[in-house]
Amino acid sequence: MSETLLTLTGVQTRIGAYHILHGVDLTVTRGNLTMLLGRNGAGKTTTLRTIMGLWRASSGTVSFAGRDITALPTPQIARLGIAYVPETMAIFADLTVKENMLLAATHARHVGDMDEARLKWIFQLFPAVEKFWNYPAGKLSGGQKQMLAVARAIVEPRELLIIDEPSKGLAPSIINNMIDAFAELKARGVTILLVEQNINFAKRLGDDVAVMEDGRVVHRGSMAAFAADEVLQQSLMGLAI
């Protein structure tokens, strides 16, 4: 029987005078990759930021592994085993790739303090991280920066990985690398929640799908069923069929 890892129930979020989320109900199954889709302005990024405590829910609850995390501060949420990669990637451009990785490794002050086996595995997932180890992160390409951002998020073991638009602006070869990496993370038991605009990327990778519109989740189901129903895709996403 599938186990729910993350649950949002009736979540509403207001930012100043703006009421952005209007009662979001969402479940993420442990071990699955859930795609959160929707047009621009649907509330996807706000949902991720609300999960992470970066913006506070004005009502409703966010639960992780059976624990109410709605009011927890962001650092405490992260310590529960949740990593978040925003669309801006959150890397330090003036630091080297190595220094970026060290900053993400909470208990390591030197490379020698890092989990050697895990670091080797990350290098296998993202060869660019090893190749450009001593390069300033700001000189990397967009795809290489995205790889570094995800590598930083998994430098320590995580139960849940949340990423906002990982395929945005990436070349097809980098997208394929990302798909392989996410598949490997899933194989290692990491649960993943991705926001995406690239429907083809989403179809190739997702187990489950939730579609947002006007601050609400208006569709939930399997990605296989969603991918097979072009009329549903067109009605929810405005896609040409």
Question: What is the role of each PLM region?
Answer:
Residues 136-140:
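Conserved ABC ATPase signature
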Residues 37-39:
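The feature captures the beta-strand-to-loop junction immediately N-terminal to the Walker
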Residues 6-8, 21:
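Conserved structural motif at the start of ABC-family nucleotide-binding domains
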Residues 52:
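Helix-to-loop junction immediately C-terminal to a conserved catalytic motif
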Residues 16, 97-117, 125-127, 221, ...:
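ABC-type ATPase nucleotide-binding domains, specifically the catalytic core motifs of the NBD
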Residues 154-159:
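A short, proline-enriched helix->beta-strand linker immediately N-terminal to the Walker B motif
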